[in-house]
Amino acid sequence: MYLKQIEIRGFKSFADRTVLELQPGMTAVVGPNGCGKSNIVDAIRWVLGEQSAKALRGASMQDVIFEGTDTRKALPTSEVVLTFTDCEKELGTAFNEVAVSRRVSRDGGSDYFINSKSARLKDVQRLFANTGVGRVSYSFMLQGQIDQILSTNASERRTIFEERSEKKPK
C-alpha cells in the first residue's frame, strides 16, 4: 500500500486545487522556505484525524482554511483527499484504491469521507489501525525530527531508517 495522490483544495496556503502524484517508495518534499512543504504534511495528518489545531500550527481548526490575500478572497471551505493504492491486503478491503477525505467549513462543520461516502473519524482510524499510517506516524518526518535524528549515533539512525522504510535489520 502507498499514498498515490494528495488533492488539496483551500487548505492553508493552497487556495487552488493542487494535485500531487506520488510513486511507491520514499518521497521527500523539498523547496525553499515558505513554499508550503509543511502544509502538505499538515494536510495529510489532518485527513488522518489530527484534532489539535496547535499540532497543525494554528489557533483553531478554521485556520486550515485559506484565509485570503490582498488579491484573493478567503475561501469558505477546505478539503483534502488522500488516495491510497494497492491496499486490499493492508486495509482488508475489496478495493485496490481507497480515497479518504476531510472537509471543514468556516461555520465549524467538519466531515470525513471514505471513497466519497460519509464516514466518522472513528471509521478512518479503524481503517488504518495497525498499518503504521495515522496522524502520528513514523512515516512522516516533521520539522525538528531531522535534527533529532542527526543527533543520534549511526546505529540508532540506521534503526530509524529501517523502521521507516520497513526494512528488516540484518
Predicted segments with their positions:
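Gly/Lys-enriched N-terminal cap/neck module of very large, oligomeric protein machines
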Residues: 2-170
